[in-house]
Amino acid sequence: MVRARMATADKKPDSKGADAVAAAIARDIHAGEFGNGAWLKQVDIEGRYRCTRADARRALEALALKGAVQRIPQRGYYVTVIDERSHRELIEVRVILETATVPSIVEQATENDIADLKRLAERFAVSIRHGDAAEKYNANRAFHVRLTELCENRELVKLALDVRGHLPATPIAQWRSQARIERSCEEHFLMIDALAARDIARLKHLVAIHIRQPEDDDRLVPKSQS
């Protein structure tokens, strides 16, 4: 027993690789586990992600190069603060990129793709009633990644998903209220209906509404234009 306890205590962190650690940190930032401006201490990164000191350091350096975190010499790293202006500008960039994927999505989507999107939309619907912040984030992201990746233009897909990843995704930042979360859930199903109907104009309109979240979005959801 004593020998077993000593072996456990002496177990060294795994060398997972800096890329894997950086990806895990990025997921947690986007899920709201680390808020705007949160400090990321290297020792905490080592413990949380069970990684080596070298991997933790390289992961933070990689995230700093991408702009996800900032470094202050002699103090360390913190999550990049997205101010209101930057947030608005990123929203509009998302609208441009994601609506640009729509024609190809409509052209490429199969019945199996549509069925899979319905499954993911249902998963998000369950998460908004019973899930925590991370579950909501992961379910919502899974739906949007699946939808976006139907686009045949791989570079456009990469750009769209990269910009999506630059936005904070805490419930407070991503959805203004529980009513807005529920509305976003409804919009997922409306987008699937538009995709099934091969209605490019309607799907573009719904994608833009879904990203911008206008106050009068109920009025802005039109009937099919096909």
Positions of PLM-derived features:
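Short linear motifs at protein or domain termini
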Residues: 1-107, 149, 219-226
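Short helix-capping and inter-helix turn/linker motifs at the boundaries of alpha-helical repeat units
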Residues: 16, 114-115, 179-182
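Short, flexible turn/loop "capping" segments at secondary-structure junctions
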Residues: 38, 71-72, 140, 183-185
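C-terminal regulatory/effector modules of DNA-binding transcriptional regulators
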Residues: 48, 176-226
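Mobile beta-alpha loop/short-helix "lid" or hinge segments that flank ligand
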Residues: 64-70, 163-165, 179-182
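Short alpha-helical transmembrane interface motifs in multi-pass membrane proteins
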Residues: 83-84, 170-174
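Conserved amphipathic alpha-helical segments that form helical-bundle/coiled-coil interaction surfaces
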Residues: 90, 102, 111-172, 186-193, ...
